[in-house]
């Protein structure tokens, strides 16, 4: 039983570790759903993190239908993760019919070599989550991150539970989206899942001394993973 934390900065990754997370999913642009992190962020986090590090590979916002150039970008990002000694990558690609883009996924998984692979929330916008789960298993993925095809994992609890039953011992189903200390016990009881995914973020006040009177989207407050929030979720998961 454990918590994976989605972190989009060095500070968030280290806070996740300090709070007792079992793993970090490193990304960039978490407010937009998450993108591939910068090379610098990845390198520094890899140097400083002691717990397993998985890296989101997503070249842009929007859907998960990627053209050949985008798949090549993703493949090269995966290769960087291999070179830096990351523990795994987080992937997902769909075709125009909303099914798993098997050629793209196979190319990316081949590039990952011995790294672990999580299939991400592309399953939640797919045409058939149950079929996507079977494809993820066949591809050799370790786990699937899902909200149960709903805006939050709590709303998708019934679908997540069905995926957990379908998966059996073949693959881990990891609920994510809106997971917090307020609902993780209900999610645990309602789904039977054994690992969960959250950002556990809280607000950080801007350090600027004199906010600009006309610009509100630059230099303001931001969100960062909070050690106490991580610890609260972890402690609840450790409660029998």
UniProtKB/Swiss-Prot annotation:
Keywords: Cytoplasm. GO terms for molecular function: copper ion binding. The keyword Flavoprotein does not apply. It is found in: Cytoplasm. Disulfide bonds: none annotated. Gene3D superfamilies: Copper homeostasis (CutC) domain (3.20.20.380). GO terms for cellular component: cytoplasm. Pfam families: CutC. InterPro entries: CutC-like (IPR005627), CutC-like_dom_sf (IPR036822). The keyword Cytoplasm applies. Belongs to the CutC family. HAMAP family: CutC. PANTHER family: COPPER HOMEOSTASIS PROTEIN CUTC, COPPER HOMEOSTASIS PROTEIN CUTC HOMOLOG. This is PF03932 family protein CutC. It comes from Xanthomonas campestris pv. campestris (strain B100).
């Amino acid at each position: 039983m454990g918590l994976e934390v989605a972190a989009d900065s060095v500070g968030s990754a280290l806070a996740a570790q300090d709070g007792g997370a079992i793993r970090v999913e490193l990304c960039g642009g978490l407010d937009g759903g998450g993108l591939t992190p910068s090379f610098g962020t990845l390198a520094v986090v890899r140097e400083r993190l002691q717990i397993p590090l998985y890296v989101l590979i997503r070249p842009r916002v929007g859907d998960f239908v990627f053209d050949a150039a985008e798949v090549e970008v993703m493949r090269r990002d995966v290769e960087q993760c291999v070179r830096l000694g990351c523990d795994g990558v987080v992937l997902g690609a769909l075709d125009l019919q909303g099914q798993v883009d098997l050629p793209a996924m196979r190319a990316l998984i081949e590039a990952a070599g011995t790294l672990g692979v999580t299939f991400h929330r592309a399953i939640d916008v797919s045409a058939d989550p149950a079929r996507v789960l079977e494809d993820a298993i066949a591809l050799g993925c370790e786990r699937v991150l899902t909200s149960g095809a709903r805006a939050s994992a709590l709303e998708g609890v019934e679908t997540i539970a069905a995926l957990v039953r379908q998966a059996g011992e073949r693959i881990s189903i990891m609920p994510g989206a809106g997971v917090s200390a307020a609902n993780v016990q209900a999610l645990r009881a309602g789904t039977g899942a054994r690992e969960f995914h959250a950002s556990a973020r809280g607000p950080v006040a801007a350090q600027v001394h004199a906010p600009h009177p006309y610009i509100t989207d630059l230099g303001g407050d931001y969100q960062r993973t909070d050690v106490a929030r991580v610890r609260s979720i972890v402690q609840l998961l450790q409660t029998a």
